[in-house]
Amino acid sequence: MTGCAGRRDRGTGRRLWAAGPLLCAILTLSACGGVDRFTTAPPSAGGPAKPARTVAQTPATEREHERILSSYGGAYDDPRLEALIGKTVDRLVAASDRPDQAYKVTILNSGAVNAFALPTGQLYVTRGLIALASDTSELSSVLSHEMAHVLAKHATIREDQARQAAVVTRVVTDMGNDPDLTALALAKTKLTMASFSRAQEFEADGIGVGISARARFDPYGAARFLTAMERNAALKAGKTSLDPRAQDFLSSHPATPERVQNAQNSARQFSSPEGGERDRETYLAAIDNIVYGEDPSEGFVRGRRFLHPKLGFSFAAPETFTLDNTAQAVIGVREGGTQAMRFDVVRVPSEQTLSDYLTSGWMENVEKGSAEELTING
């Protein structure tokens, strides 16, 4: 990887720093802790090329797509990466049990390490995850894992399971006013859902490894990448007091030793003497010049300082604060979690003061008497 070059296509909801007043506040907390660039289609066996299948769109999935773009900095536009991912997904689709299923892939402009799928076949992968992978087989393991969730209809099944769990909890709650009984019901519901999600992840791993292997990619790519993600999370944890998994793949795809071992066991069933394809050189050439970490056009964090070269300003957080430049705002947390800071852009009605806005529900748990006004540089 070289430099910090690349092209971005921001989705709706991304911070527009010049759009309104800038708010920065130290808040006392209450006690407690892309645009869709390319579509894959089933390959035709000889004859004229068939038109690409399109992923079914509904108002709900369109809203979810826009929400995802807003949360992850919009779509990241890189033709070389798109070409590589398109070819990879085409091979995976042909090797899957449902070669008639179409997929639409969006690269997200986020340094977080994450990937996910909508039930319709819309797949999302962040440039942070792409940068962490070492070869095409590792990327294929992530894509095939998300395809497996679609093929196994995990989202639909999980929604049904959650609905049933909610009914059980409501029935138990309505049976009486025993808070201990209600708490026990809620705890059992959470445990059931966690166990259910864990089982789905293991199933998706097994299906995904099989798809990658049949597509002639190295089936051990999944285990290698799970290990890389865990090491990456541990490295981040040593540098920040914020949860490094907040927006990352590991928040919903825990890379436990058991899961890594499961991926290795699945790979052994498909490994051959000649091994599968890793395609490292092609992969490294495709990710050359990818933006790594934060998008400099949206500002970046260095230590306790936030800098925005494009708009020509910077500020430093108080000592013991850790900053995180998210898609929505710059967030700071004091060591121990007793105080937080948010640097944001809002449109305040002309008849409302900034102090009133700060205490009107902009953030939860803001002490109304804690808002103070000051003027900086006139």
Language-model segments: residues:
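Hydrophobic alpha-helical segments, especially transmembrane helices
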Residues: R15-L16, V260
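A Zn2+-metalloprotease active-site environment signal
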Residues: C32-P318, T322-G378
